Structure formats: structure tokens, C-alpha cells
């Protein structure tokens, strides 16, 4: 963030907030564990020190650090002190965290500041932490930073004619380079397991890049569908759902994937898709079905809960309609789908899309570049890979 403020002629206002747990984080304990693992990988790629002084952050001093930072709220020193506290906390510097925590003039001072910040964020239309907001649009973490920098570049408000090397390196790190032909070493790799929900726009978007990566390396993709979160007893509040759809639309435009006319398949539509998928798999048409069903749901507003809609999708896949109807009448699919959910949860993920390749587990459609990087590393025998 300091580099962003230095490179562009912008005014940056930093707010101390916290992520809302109730309803917005369906598996908070799992999220904490996964987030640390994910941030370790990101920090390694971006060259940022992360938990290099301890295995875990000093959570016992989190409240004290927040109170110490809150003491400078409203002053020019606030953002600098907040950035310093964040670095200390997420590098695992227990000694420094203890010292700053003791310096807090008033215990509980952060609570009032956080409440004000949360109220502002809610009025602006969001609920999560690590969010940037500019002129009506939200940008989450480093994964959406390129949208903001593109917007600022288009406005011509850069202070320098040369790009900021640090900001540029983040963009470069997340680019995918694929081999012109599958390397020999890829033949020994296991299948990519892809946990998918027909109600998840991110699942639909990530299918395309996952298949592209797998095809480039000659690796099979095993689609493992699960029920939508709301059909598994996990809440998806309105503001979260609205942001997801807006963000997915933005991502779809960037990737050139059809998106926008939506028919929510929750309930009967999702169940029918799951049943038909297993039939499609038995006919070697699983890949075709998830792609066509996704396009129908997320870009053509096809109602897959109806026979007319489902017939439209399955016709494109070359599936026999009488057999499709028979598949939708049974309940045999439920055990397989539940097994997929259990497997995903055992690996430390609760949401989709989740990708597993051996011991690597990635959550989110914006980790496709990390999957490609991991496969490249597994295939690198020292002779290099032609990309």
C-alpha cells in the first residue's frame, strides 16, 4: 500500500477493521489455517517476509497491538503505525508485539475505532477485510490489485513515467506461462482433482483455466462436484453474494468468458445438475457437461431445474435425453457427492472451487497461476521447459 501511494497521485485513507465472522465465514477455524498456508505461498512468490520469526502470529498481543495503533487514529502517523504493527504481527515477532502492546495508553481503544470503520465499510457495500475501495469499486487483496492500478494508469495520475517495479512484479508473478508441448515428466503426475459447484460463478470461471493448464501438461482433470454451500447448511449473506457476482463478472470480462445472464440453480436445479453429471461422466461427457451447464446458468439464464432447460444443455453435450431423465429420477448420486464434500473438507477446504494435485490444495479461481507454477516446478528436471 505505501508503494501504491508513492507511485500514484492519490490520497490514501487507511481504516482499522476486522472481518465479519457471523454468516460471512462459514468455516472460520478452517479459514484461519488455510489463510496462513495460502499467505505463506503468496509471500514466497512476492518476496515478502511472512512468519519468518515464528510459525504463528502472536495472537495473544493482537488486541494490544490494535489498541496501540488506535491511539494515533486521526493523526498523520496512523497509517505508518498500522503498517508497522501488521508487519510485526505477520512476521511473528513476539518480542516487538509485546513491547508495542504494552505501550497502548488505553485498553479497548481499538473497539470504537473498528466499529466506526465497519459502519463506513458497510455503508459502502462491503463486509471483508483487506479490501481497497476507489470510486465505487472494491478490490480484494493482491488478487484484484491489478484492476485498481489499471484504472489509475488510465487516469494518467502516475507520478513517474516508469512503472513501479514492486507493483509490476506482483502482476508478473501471477501470469501463467504454459509449455508448447507436454513435458515428459508430467506423465508421472496424478490427476488434478477439481471440486466444483454448479451454483458457484467462480467454479464456472476456473474450469476454463484449469482445463487449459491440464491440457498443456497432458494431465487428467477429475471433476468432483459438491452441493452449493447454502444446501450444505452454510450461509451466504446478500452483500457477500452481490459482491461475488459483481467480481465474477469483472473476472469473466478479463478472461473473455461469457457471463451475465444468470438463472440461479439453487435447489432442484443444482440437484439435477449433480445427477446428470454422474451420468455424463459414465458417457465420457463430464467435461462437456460442466462447461455447457456453466455457460447456460451463468451467461444464458437457462433454467436447469426445468426439463426444457436441462434438455437444452444435455443436447449440446450429445447426451441421450431418455437416459438423462432416468438419471434425474434417482438418488444414487447423493453418496458420491457427499463423498466429494468429505474429501474436500478433510483437505482443509470448505468452499469451491478447490483444486488438489497431490499434497497441494488451492482454493479459489484466482489461484490457477499457482497451480500452473507448481506443475511447472514438478516437471522441471533441470533441462528447462519450452514455453
Model-derived features with residue positions:
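Conserved strand-turn element in the central/C-terminal portion of the radical SAM core barrel
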Residues: 55-58, 103, 195-199, 263-267, ...
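Short, flexible turn/loop "capping" segments at secondary-structure junctions
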Residues: 185-188, 269
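Structural alpha/beta surface segment adjacent to cysteine/selenocysteine redox centers
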Residues: 1-88, 204-297, 382-386
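C-terminal cap of thioredoxin/glutaredoxin-like
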Residues: 1-6, 84-181, 191, 205-213, ...
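Conserved aromatic-histidine-acidic binding/catalytic patches
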Residues: 27, 136, 184, 198, ...
Amino acid at each position: 500500500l505505501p508503494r501504491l501511494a508513492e507511485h500514484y497521485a492519490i490520497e490514501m485513507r487507511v481504516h482499522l477493521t476486522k472481518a465479519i465472522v457471523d454468516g460471512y465465514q462459514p468455516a472460520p477455524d478452517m479459514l484461519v489455517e488455510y489463510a496462513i498456508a495460502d499467505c505463506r505461498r503468496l509471500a514466497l512468490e512476492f518476496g515478502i517476509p511472512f512468519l519468518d520469526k515464528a510459525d504463528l502470529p502472536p495472537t495473544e498481543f493482537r488486541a494490544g497491538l490494535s489498541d496501540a495503533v488506535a491511539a494515533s487514529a486521526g493523526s498523520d502517523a496512523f497509517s505508518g503505525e498500522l503498517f508497522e504493527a501488521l508487519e510485526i504481527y505477520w512476521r511473528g515477532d513476539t518480542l516487538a508485539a509485546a513491547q508495542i502492546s504494552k505501550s497502548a495508553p488505553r485498553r479497548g481503544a481499538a473497539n470504537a475505532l473498528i466499529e466506526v470503520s465497519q459502519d463506513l465499510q458497510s455503508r459502502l457495500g462491503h463486509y471483508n477485510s483487506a479490501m481497497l475501495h476507489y470510486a465505487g469499486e472494491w478490490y480484494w487483496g493482491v488478487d484484484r490489485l491489478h484492476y485498481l492500478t489499471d484504472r489509475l494508469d488510465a487516469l494518467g495520475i502516475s507520478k513517474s513515467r516508469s512503472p513501479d517495479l514492486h507493483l509490476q512484479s506482483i502482476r508478473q508473478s501471477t501470469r501463467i506461462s504454459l509449455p508448447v508441448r507436454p513435458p515428459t515428466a508430467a506423465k508421472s503426475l496424478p490427476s488434478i482433482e477439481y471440486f466444483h459447484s454448479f451454483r458457484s460463478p467462480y467454479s464456472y470461471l476456473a474450469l476454463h483455466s484449469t482445463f487449459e493448464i491440464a491440457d498443456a501438461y497432458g494431465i487428467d482433470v477429475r471433476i468432483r462436484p459438491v452441493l452449493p454451500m447454502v444446501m450444505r447448511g452454510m450461509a451466504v449473506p446478500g452483500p457477500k453474494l452481490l459482491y461475488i457476482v459483481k467480481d465474477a463478472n469483472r473476472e469473466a470480462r478479463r478472461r473473455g468468458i461469457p457471463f451475465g445472464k444468470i438463472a440461479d440453480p439453487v435447489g432442484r436445479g443444482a440437484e439435477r445438475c449433480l445427477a446428470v453429471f454422474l451420468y455424463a461422466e459414465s458417457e465420457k461427457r463430464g467435461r462437456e457437461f460442466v462447461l455447457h451447464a456453466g455457460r447456460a446458468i451463468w451467461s444464458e439464464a437457462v433454467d436447469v431445474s426445468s426439463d426444457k432447460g436441462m434438455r437444452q444443455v444435455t443436447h449440446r453435450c450429445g447426451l441421450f435425453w431418455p437416459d438423462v431423465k432416468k438419471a434425474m429420477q434417482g438418488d444414487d448420486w447423493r453418496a458420491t457427492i457427499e463423498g466429494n464434500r468429505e474429501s474436500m473438507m478433510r483437505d482443509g477446504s470448505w468452499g469451491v472451487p478447490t483444486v488438489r494435485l497431490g499434497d497441494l490444495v488451492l482454493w479459489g479461481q484466482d489461484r490457477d497461476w499457482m497451480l500452473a507454477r507448481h506443475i511447472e516446478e514438478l516437471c522441471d528436471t533441470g533441462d528447462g521447459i519450452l514455453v
